[in-house]
């Protein structure tokens, strides 16, 4: 991310819902939220979900800490996470005219030591423009070229998940991931960031399950 445009200005953020399948769910959720470090983040927890805004690295660190703390109780927990970067799509976007897609550094998370299974989907919301089938993506503002193939970055992301050893299977409307919670979140976030280097507005959604009684 450049120093001229903050993550908030570029619309970098997350919205997530933590679900705990236990009668003591209120305490477990509140304790998990309290256990995470909010430094450098804007956090707003409402009656439906929690909004987080900040750098990609800090957002994912916070999510890992909250989910890990809840899972440490041993009860079945799940988290529904939406990550978004780029405009339009965010109430606080202040992106100057003419700004193309902005890249960001890949995130790195410390191993959690707890298994997570997930369903993951990636949505590039603006196809890159290519002058021909082999050229690099171009800014849309020129009005020339043909739409890029939006499936191309999705297939690349799935390939990356396979290379990382996190890919488990292809399910209906989602890719199944399986591994350490940190590795799952890294795979999801770094694919989201990588696509965002060429496509300004990118959204990814992941549902994570831990300690599930369902055997797979």
Question: Could you say what each language-model-derived stretch is?
Answer:
Residues 2-216:
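Charge-rich, low-complexity N-terminal segments
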């Amino acid at each position: 991310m450049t120093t001229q445009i903050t993550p908030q200005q570029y619309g970098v953020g997350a919205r997530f819902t933590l679900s705990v399948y236990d009668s003591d769910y209120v305490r477990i959720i509140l304790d998990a939220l309290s256990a995470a470090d909010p430094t450098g983040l804007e956090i707003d927890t409402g009656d439906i979900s929690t909004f987080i805004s900040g750098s990609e690295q800090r957002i994912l660190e916070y999510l890992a800490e909250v989910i890990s703390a809840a899972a440490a109780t041993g009860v079945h927990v799940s988290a529904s996470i939406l990550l978004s970067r780029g405009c339009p799509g965010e109430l606080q976007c202040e992106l100057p005219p003419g700004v193309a897609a902005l890249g960001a550094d890949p995130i790195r998370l410390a191993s959690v030591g707890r298994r997570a299974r997930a369903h993951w989907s990636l949505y590039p919301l603006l196809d890159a423009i290519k002058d021909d089938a082999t050229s690099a993506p171009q800014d849309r503002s020129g009005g020339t070229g043909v739409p890029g193939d939006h499936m191309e970055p999705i297939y690349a992301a799935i390939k990356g998940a396979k290379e990382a050893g996190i890919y488990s299977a292809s399910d209906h409307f989602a890719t199944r991931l399986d591994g350490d919670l940190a590795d799952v979140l890294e795979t999801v976030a770094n694919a989201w960031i990588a696509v965002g280097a060429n496509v300004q507005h990118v959204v990814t959604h992941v549902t994570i399950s831990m300690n599930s009684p369902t055997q797979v």
